[in-house]
Amino acid sequence: VRDAYIAQNYNCVYFCMKDDYCNDLCTKNGASSGYCQWAGKYGNACWCYALPDNVPIRIPGKCHS
């Protein structure tokens, strides 16, 4: 498990405005919790705690949407 930005397809983050949205997204994917990090490295994006290794995370490089 790891703490990381959860990723959609093509290495793109989940943009957010509210912690509830990210906490729900993260826990549905097996994380312990999550929140919306504002003005972070990738803008306003969901950060998850204890996300399982099989769930994609944002890695260095471009978002190819």
Curated annotation (Swiss-Prot):
Alphabetic keyword roster: Disulfide bond, Ion channel impairing toxin, Neurotoxin, Secreted, Toxin, Voltage-gated sodium channel impairing toxin
Domain LCN-type CS-alpha/beta: start-end pairs: 2-64
InterPro entries in the record: LCN-type_CS_alpha_beta_dom, Scorpion_toxin-like, Scorpion_toxin-like_sf, Scorpion_toxinL, Scorpion_toxinL/defensin
Family to which the UniProt record says this protein belongs: Belongs to the long (4 C-C) scorpion toxin superfamily. Sodium channel inhibitor family. Alpha subfamily.
Tissue: Expressed by the venom gland.
Gene3D superfamilies: Knottin, scorpion toxin-like
Compartments, as annotated in UniProt: Secreted
UniProt-listed SMART domains: Knot1
Protein purpose: Alpha toxins bind voltage-independently at site-3 of sodium channels (Nav) and inhibit the inactivation of the activated channels, thereby blocking neuronal transmission. This contractive toxin is highly toxic to insects and barely toxic to mammals.
Cysteine disulfide partners in this protein: C12-C63, C16-C36, C22-C46, C26-C48
One Gene Ontology term, aspect cellular component: extracellular region
Designated name of the protein: Alpha-insect toxin BotIT1
Domain comment, as recorded: Has the structural arrangement of an alpha-helix connected to antiparallel beta-sheets by disulfide bonds (CS-alpha/beta).
CDD domains (alphabetical): neurotoxins_LC_scorpion (cd23106)
Highest taxon, organism lineage: Eukaryota
SUPFAM superfamilies named in the record: Scorpion toxin-like
Native source species: Buthus occitanus tunetanus (Common European scorpion)
GO biological process, one term: defense response
Molecular-function GO term, any one: sodium channel inhibitor activity
